[in-house]
Design a protein with these regions (language model features):
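A glycine/proline-hinged amphipathic helix-loop "lid/cap" segment
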Residues: 1-73, 217-220
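Alpha/beta-hydrolase superfamily serine-hydrolase fold, recognizing
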Residues: 7, 57-59, 63-68, 72-255
Length: 255
């Protein structure tokens, strides 16, 4: 365990981040509502920044949800990155996500498609998130060869980076797989009330004292938010039960 980690974990414990994940469904959604009311993206300001920095920013629509494309040139590049932000499926991206998207475009020469995917709430469940994310990838394959597309996701977005293609396999593989998937800190929200997952629940409780961020209780709360009373395919909630047949080279990062 590095000194940097020890310092960071101590700070996280002291500021009480973990307490937030003890909130119930209603409290968590109220918290998310407040976070999502903040203005984190202004299209006109973003376009002005693109002009100053000599690149192009395009605003698109995917099933009623915004998608912005960072491009070095007015015409599409040979390859692209689908950027899926993190936020537990309930909170919007932050300003660092946009800066990183810009940086990826500048350093790789690839276009970056940034999807504002549907967030889970009382009225929107995770199957809608998958539907829109899958459609965004389908649209990408109309512009770029699938092998020239990389899919990058963080946290809940990392779950989507895998889940889009678990979904593709589940519905008969209508789309070609991307060239690579980069999944940073993916998780899952298995049903810990069923017998086959009891061991997972016991391990979560056993490791709780080591986890400086998330209390095991949140697994149940997050599942309640994402699923509600809907009949949702289990792979959308717990990617470990999905079909990984013919997946491309996939990079996992944790920490």
């Amino acid at each position: 365990m590095s000194l940097t980690y020890k310092i960071a974990s101590t700070i996280v414990r002291l500021i009480g981040v973990k307490k937030m994940f003890l909130k119930n469904k209603e409290e968590m959604l109220e918290y998310a509502k407040g976070e999502n009311a903040k203005v984190v993206f202004d299209l006109e300001k973003a376009k002005a920044r693109a002009t100053r920095k000599n690149y192009y920013l395009f605003d698109m629509d995917v099933m009623g949800y915004r998608l912005i494309s960072y491009q070095k040139n007015q015409t599409p590049a040979d390859g692209a990155v689908l950027y899926l932000f993190g936020g537990g499926m309930i909170t919007q991206p932050n300003k660092l996500d946009f800066k990183l998207s810009e940086r990826i475009m500048e350093q790789t020469g690839k276009d970056v498609w940034f999807l504002f995917y549907p967030l889970c709430s009382e009225n929107v469940k995770i199957d809608k998130t998958y539907e829109v994310s899958f459609e965004a990838y389908r649209l990408m394959t109309e512009t770029y060869k699938a092998e020239n597309i990389s899919v990058l996701g963080f946290s809940s977005g990392a779950c989507l980076s895998l889940g889009i293609f678990l979904h593709n396999n589940a519905i008969g593989r209508p789309l070609s797989m991307p060239g690579k998937i980069i999944s940073v800190s993916p998780g899952g929200i298995p049903d810990v009330t069923v017998d086959e997952n009891k061991e997972i629940w016991e391990k979560l409780k056993e490791l709780n004292h080591k986890d400086v961020m998330i209390d095991p209780t949140y697994i149940k709360t997050a599942r309640e938010i994402a699923k509600g009373d809907e009949d949702i395919p289990e792979y959308m909630l717990d990617g470990t039960v999905g079909d990984f047949t013919d997946f491309p080279k996939t990079y996992f990062y944790f920490g």
